[in-house]
From Swiss-Prot:
Residues 24-108 form the DEP domain. It comes from Mus musculus. PANTHER family: DEP DOMAIN-CONTAINING, DEP DOMAIN-CONTAINING PROTEIN 1B. Keywords: GTPase activation, Phosphoprotein. PROSITE patterns: DEP, RHOGAP. Gene3D superfamilies: Rho GTPase activation protein, Winged helix-like DNA-binding domain superfamily/Winged helix DNA-binding domain. SMART domains: DEP. The modification Phosphoserine is found at residues 160, 436. It comes from the Eukaryota. GO terms for molecular function: GTPase activator activity. This is DEP domain-containing protein 1B. InterPro entries: DEP_dom, Rho_GTPase_activation_prot, RhoGAP_dom, WH-like_DNA-bd_sf, WH_DNA-bd_sf.
């Protein structure tokens, strides 16, 4: 009974449902049963289905050993509701599924769930703020992107050190980095890290990035106590005092120094029920509805524990500060109760750890729209959270360091050369798109030469340069990029055409040189004539 791991990505809950249905229909043992003096072929009892499916789920890396028999019964009830199975008389949809000897069978066909058509939240790539960006609130659609192309003057300034020409420079401060710029850097970098860890081409199918608040991320990073718990600015969003006192009482059991009420037999069960009732009546789960798909997607990384922890760290940074604080306090209490050997049993039917998972999983993670596997997925996530909450709910140091260094770099004094463009010398990181193998081969062969060839033509066509300066720059270009230069000037003759030799001016002849040499007696001969 192998249940392949369903990795991260969109529609993971639906993919898990279809995978489980296919395995159940293909491998559930069928045999002959008798009921009320009548025999039925190719069927199974409810208890047999619970036994087999429970074992499958417990051995699956997608769900884990924490799956209870009760959850398996609930899942089979959903199978009956969705006509994955039917009772022996062909009834399905309205009947309740119970763990008994009732007979069930598979219908001739069991349709798999189609993948839901979700709105594409955001097709644009995540971008860093530029200095030329309009202020927040203005439209940023159809803004042309100016390619970064270096003209000949900038190129020769960059390479002029090689020939000993260092241009004058001065220190300048960059433009003021606004709070909106910093917030956008935090949001863009965090989402970029999450997208990279999940291995997705885009987050649009698992997360609506428009609902992600950069202010939440920054608050969750910097407004924390020495223990790493978020500190809220708005005290009205704090846990009620009586809930916080009850949580401290169970977390420090039996040393309840803050609890002034009299204790009695079963007191700890009533305190636990009080806490469970408060969390169970929250309007929204702690991990929020709009982050459900993101957290479910991260569950596909659980076989790689370290990677899963990093992904959960980033997802938890996106939570509202009040949700993150409530989650931190709840996980600390749950972990301490499970490790406390002096804590009396809080339930007669479950162990302490299983009780924690079953009680709080739905208030931590659930979908706004009913999802057939949300109970199992929530239990899997809460189990992993309990084992790794200290790592998951702390600020990822690598992310914080990367962003702080980038912000400091943007604010640092820069060296500027006359005529240089600061936005070119310090360009923001950009994101890539996938290209075809043919386009890649073309770019590898010609992509780097085309801009250089254009630069060479610009130098050749520059009429402001004297012949001496132009020859000097062409010689420098030839030394740096001989292949490009050779392609433009394949022969010395082609190079000579660029600098044609001017014809030398002949010396002016005097009029007397054109005459014949002086002949003696010339005047005498003229007399004779």
């Amino acid at each position: 009974m192998e249940h392949r791991v369903v990795g991260p990505g969109p529609y993971r809950a639906t993919r898990l449902w279809n995978e489980t249905v296919e395995l159940f229909r293909a491998r559930m043992p069928l045999r002959r049963h008798r009921c009320r003096f009548k025999s039925y072929e190719h069927c199974f009892t409810a208890s047999e289905a619970v036994d087999w499916l429970h074992e499958l789920l417990r051995n699956s890396q997608n769900f884990g050993p924490e799956v209870t028999r009760k959850q398996t019964v609930q899942l089979l009830g959903k199978f009956l509701k969705n006509h994955v199975i039917e009772d022996i008389k062909g009834k399905w949809g309205q009947e309740d599924f119970e763990d008994n000897r009732h007979l069930y069978r598979f219908p001739p066909s069991s349709p798999l769930k189609p993948y839901p058509k979700k709105p594409l939240y955001q097709r644009d790539v995540i971008k860093f703020p530029e200095w030329n960006d309009p202020p927040p609130g203005t439209s940023q659609e159809n803004i042309p992107v100016r390619p970064i192309v270096m003209n000949s003057e900038m190129w020769f300034k960059r390479h002029s050190i090689a020939i000993g020409e260092v241009p004058a420079c001065r220190l300048v401060h960059r433009r003021q980095l606004t709070e909106a710029n910093v917030e956008e850097i935090w949001k863009s970098t965090t989402l970029s890290y999450l997208q990279k860890i999940l291995g997705l081409d885009s987050l649009e199918e698992v997360l609506n990035t428009k609902l992600v608040s950069s202010k939440f991320i920054i608050h969750n990073v910097y407004s924390v106590s020495k223990q790493g718990v978020v500190i809220l600015d708005d005290k009205s969003k704090e846990l009620p005092h009586w809930v916080l006192s009850a949580m401290k009482c169970l977390a420090n059991w039996p040393n309840c120094t803050d609890w002034k009420q009299p204790m009695y037999l079963g007191f700890e069960k009533d305190v636990f029920k009080t806490i469970a009732d408060y969390y169970g009546h929250l309007k929204e789960p702690l991990l929020t509805f709009h982050l459900f798909d993101a957290f479910v997607s991260v569950l596909g990384l659980l076989p790689k524990e370290k990677t899963a922890i990093e992904a959960f760290q980033l997802c938890c940074l996106l939570l509202p500060p009040e949700n993150r604080r409530k989650l931190q306090l709840l996980m600390r209490m749950m972990a301490r109760i499970c490790l406390n050997k002096e804590m009396p049993p809080l339930s007669d039917g479950f162990g302490t750890r299983t009780l924690m998972v079953q009680t709080f999983s739905r208030c931590i993670l659930c979908s706004k729209d009913e999802v057939d596997l949300d109970e199992l997925l929530a239990a899997r996530l809460v189990t992993f959270l309990m084992d790794n909450y200290q790592e998951i709910l702390k600020v990822p140091l690598a992310l914080q360091t990367s962003i702080e260094e980038r912000v400091a770099h943007l604010r640092r004094v820069q060296i500027k050369y006359p005529g240089a463009d600061m936005d070119i010398t310090l360009s923001a990181p950009s994101f890539c798109r996938q290209i075809s193998p043919e386009e890649f081969e073309y770019q590898r062969a010609y992509g780097s030469q085309e801009p250089l060839a254009a630069l060479l033509e610009e130098v050749i066509a520059d009429d402001k340069l004297s012949s001496k300066e132009k020859k000097k720059k062409l010689k420098q270009f030839q030394k740096s990029y001989p292949e490009v230069y050779q392609e433009r000037f394949p022969t010395p003759e082609s190079e000579a055409l660029l600098f044609p030799e001017k014809p030398k001016a002949k010396p002016q002849l005097f009029m007397w040189a054109l005459r014949k040499p002086f002949q003696p007696f010339q005047r005498t001969r003229s007399f004779r004539m």
